[in-house]
A protein has these predicted regions:
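PP2C/PPM-type serine/threonine phosphatase catalytic domain
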Residues: 1-196
Length: 196
């Protein structure tokens, strides 16, 4: 069975952020066939839809998506920005982040220029890659990975609003017989207590 799950998150300091996210998701829907998405196509759609109006020029969004094109057990993960995809592994009963943010801090980490656990100014979290309603904006190709899922593994696609509050190592475990609604309520309670 073929399917696609995605989340787009409008960048809060850009104009009409919610409209940017909606437009990015709409760009995905324009492609009726399930196939690997091209970041350039989504970028061009956003430009065509929003860059030519004064109030929406520069509207920006991130995107994370998971696709299954029918290959047994394998999913394709694509993302730009700081929306993420997580895996809950039934094997080790832990959540694992499958994507890396496209920001300056992550770039420094990849280059070995920062110390784990160190405090860094919030400016280092600035995004390096995102979609933007500006014809001069260049977007890189998606970061694409494949993941093999085993029985009772679970995937979660989310925005930075979740992982900025609580890292996945603190998330409640997902039990095989647990209803998704119960897990989501546990997660919401955990997030609420972190923000209090």
């Amino acid at each position: 069975e073929q399917w696609c799950v995605a989340v787009a998150d409008g960048i809060s300091n850009s104009p009409v952020a919610e409209q940017a996210a909606y437009t990015v998701l709409n760009a995905l829907m324009q492609n009726k066939k399930i196939e690997t998405c091209q970041a350039f196509t989504i970028q061009q759609y956003l430009v065509d839809q929003l860059a030519h109006q004064k109030n929406s020029f520069g509207a920006s969004s991130t995107l994370a998506l998971i696709q299954n094109n029918g290959e047994q057990g394998f999913v394709t993960i694509q993302h730009i920005g700081d929306s993420r995809v997580y895996l809950f592994s039934q094997h080790d009963q832990k959540w694992h982040c499958l994507t890396r943010d496209h920001n300056y801090l992550e770039q420094l980490r990849e280059n070995g220029e920062i110390k784990e656990g160190g405090n860094y100014a919030s400016i280092y979290g600035a995004l390096l890659q995102y979609f933007c309603a500006d014809p001069l904006h260049e977007v890189m190709d998606f970061t694409t990975t494949e993941e093999y899922l085993t029985e009772n593994d679970a995937l979660l696609v989310c925005t930075d609003g979740v992982h900025d509050v609580m890292e996945c190592t603190e998330w409640p475990a997902l039990k095989v017989d647990m209803e998704l609604r119960a897990w989501l309520l546990d997660m919401k309670a955990s997030l609420d207590s972190k923000q209090a």
